[in-house]
Amino acid sequence: MSNKHPLVQVIENAQLIERPSFAPGDTVVVQVKVREGERERLQAFEGVVIAKRNRGLNSAFTVRKISSGVGVERAFQLHSPIIDSIEVKRRGAVRRAKLYYLRERSGKSARIREKLAPRAPKVVKPKADA
């Protein structure tokens, strides 16, 4: 339930951009539009989603990567027009909504297990009586 004026809700809903679903622990590649003078190019930022904030038009997420041995975090607005695309590389199996503890970890202790795809249920074949 939202306590916003109905007209504000209509305008905000028109601004929403369709994005793929992802969660904390997932490795994503965010293609960001970068303006350099007259030119505009795409810059890829690949890392692990350590936080996600779902607030409609104000939704945001934080991506962390290690670049030259230094941890780099970047926060993005989910529905921002500067984001060209978001691609989910792998799904991570985590048990927390915010993965801020990864900031203190490095190397193998900072790894995240991969979420396995659900298996098809086994079909039990009835034995044929001969």
UniProtKB/Swiss-Prot annotation:
Biological processes, Gene Ontology terms: translation
GO molecular function, one term: structural constituent of ribosome
Any GO CC annotation of this UniProt entry: cytosolic large ribosomal subunit
Residues passing through the membrane, by range: none
Keywords assigned by UniProt, alphabetized: Ribonucleoprotein, Ribosomal protein
Record's signal peptide: none
Known function: This protein is located at the 30S-50S ribosomal subunit interface and may play a role in the structure and function of the aminoacyl-tRNA binding site.
Family the UniProt entry places it in: Belongs to the bacterial ribosomal protein bL19 family.
Protein name: Large ribosomal subunit protein bL19
Lineage: Bacteria, Pseudomonadati, Pseudomonadota, Gammaproteobacteria, Moraxellales
Gene (name only): rplS
